[in-house]
Amino acid sequence: MNVMINACFYFLDCANVSYAIRCAVSFAYCKPKGTSLQARPPNMPLNGWIPSENEFAWGLPGKTPPFEEGFDPLGFTNLVSLGDFKRYREAEVTHGRVAMLAALGFIVSERFHPLFGLPETEVLAIDALTMVRKEVPFFFEILAITIATAELFRALVGWAPPSFGTVAMGDTLQDDYYPGDIGFDPLGLKPTDMEEFEELEAKELNNGRLAMIGISGMVAQELVDHKPILSWWEDNFGLSF
């Protein structure tokens, strides 16, 4: 229970740090009165996408079989503006990417952890950070700086300066920013063909959604059984790793 509570507070703190960074960066980059930010001309596509309120999810990629028309039985996508939907998609893509890294790291770290003086035996991933901190007292401070740096870069790329007098200051994406596309592609893997780009983005969304469910399930399983996830799979499904 303590692990769950600490995890909840940790992620809440990360969310607050993320919001604070966006606000701070937005204030720092506000233009003086009388000047304007350069905006993308109307109807100019972002990665081949022109928003349309007549299409599912404003026309953003993500519709895959067996739901070729999109899956939203409760109609949530019909209740939000374009700006809000872009922000939700940005959040979904970002959380999905983090979850994919977390799911991979969760499994690998239990049997392969050569750093930080951890024991050579199999360890519980949910206990690994606590063990690391005993060896590296300032580990979480270093981790927080790393996360803040990544969030700072994302805020500089995609988030608009605040509108003074509104409630959601620093919580709006720029008009010419495509959700999730922060321009980080060192290997040049981003397709230039629109159809190929939409296909790969749909795959990323689906894998990210699965990873969010998967990492939640693995954490819950270890909290209940206190057994490394790979060993649990071996004992219950006869899998060998």
Report the location of each language-model feature.
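Active-site or metal-binding loop neighborhoods of secreted/extracellular toxin and effector enzymes
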Residues: M1
